[in-house]
Amino acid sequence: MSLRAALGPAIDRAGAFLEAEGAAGFPEAHHRMRFPRWAGIVGGSVEHVAEVFAPAVIADLLVDAADLCEGAAAARWRAVARRQADRVARARLTDRPGGWSYFPDLPELPPDLDSLGAAIRLFARAAPEHLPLIEDPIRIALAGAEPSGLPRTWIIAPDAPPKARKRMRRGVRWHWGDTVDPEVCARFFLGLHAMDAVRFAPEIARGAAAIAAAQAPGGLWPATWYAGPVYGTALCAELMVATGHIRAAEAGRAALAKAVHPAGGWGMWEAVPLDTAIALALLADSLPPEAVARAVELLLSYQNPDGSWPGTQWIQMEVGRALGRVRRRITWQSDTVTTAFALRALLAVARRIDPDMTIEKAETA
């Protein structure tokens, strides 16, 4: 079977899987976690559920997918993204300023810039009527930015209720770490760029320059909250392209191209579906055709009969980092997240093969 012929059925199954999951708000992508009460966490010993961040990223990826094709499927994916944007809007915090917290019922966990960036980007692209909800969180985040122009990951508003502010600051000091994280800032500035690139031009320009300066000598970007360098580098490289830092973007792409495993995919120790999908989407238009074919063949080999891909490590938390000594690394993965990245990657390859590709054409190729 030719590459063109293989893409259509795989894309069709992946899209159907994501549409079905999206009808219920992507429940498989809800991150569930318990925190130990012995560590002094008030919200410990009960299960906390993150229902906003990963589904918002998935919905944004569906907008990417729709942008890469036309036809009925693209319209359905935009509708799924729109419904998810409505869910995100309803989940905005009401007990403290700052927007969204990854685990909203955990008192020690502040609202965060990554969740805010995901909300901004999704609202801007799928449901602009919700953009007024993010005006105040953006103001707070930018007001607390470092001299470099990069905001800190945790958004603790000066006018938050005193008790809540005390708990959040304690959580940051002892558990989460008070950091500026390039990959988180990249998502935030990509969100501002999608929302209003003219209005936020000075802030985006300063932030992008600082992120370009944070690039490692080899071309990759470090990531605090994601496993391995692939996703953080992809986010930062996307911002570099959007803001005209072409040399930094090309260095990042070149570094990822060199990091491919002999099997044809990407991953920290071996090729895995998630990293392969992320890298392939970024490099689909620049890799040699034979390298694209190997990566696609590998990615397709991982697809499940129901159209999904098995999850591989995505989000990470380094336990002890806040106190200067990482004791262990907790990771989380999701089949639905991996499938959304894989769908985007396959569509990027299909677009390279046929710039006028539609899902209907892919299915009959």
What does each model-found stretch correspond to?
Residues M1-A365:
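Preference for long, amphipathic alpha-helical scaffolds in soluble/luminal domains
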